[in-house]
Amino acid sequence: MSLCFNNIQIFTGENFSLHQEINDEINNNFSHVALLYPEQSPSAFKREPSDIRLLIVIDGTWKKAFKIYSLSVNLHSLPKISFFDKIKSSYRIRSSSKTNSLSSLEATNKALEKIEPDLDTKALTKLFEKMIDFQIEKMGEEIFTKNYDKKKGSD
């Protein structure tokens, strides 16, 4: 994502509860902050997309993202952006039985489309597609077909 947008900050870790920079951003901009994180049902505490100026994204596997969220108690009170309409993932090398199980990049892209409708996110989508093509190329067509291509792999 940092290849496509210049107003992005990346922090690495598992527990951001005491992370000074993140806490300063949350405290100074609370009415304009949202967390991109799945919820089971729409919550009562919502934020209009146009009000969001800071979007916090947890990037990792589902298990890792859950752990980061669980440990980072400073994120628990933030309003969340979740998707309740059915969205099909384009991540062809990932299989998940969960509804709306988008990659972090896909979910961020969808969130940005809601937050900033005039923002051109095509570069992000193209980068994502190239990354997938590269990974398929490296694993080989046979492995891709066997493990991920449901149309061909089920023959």
Model-derived segments and spans:
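Residue-level signal for inorganic ion chemistry
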Residues: 1
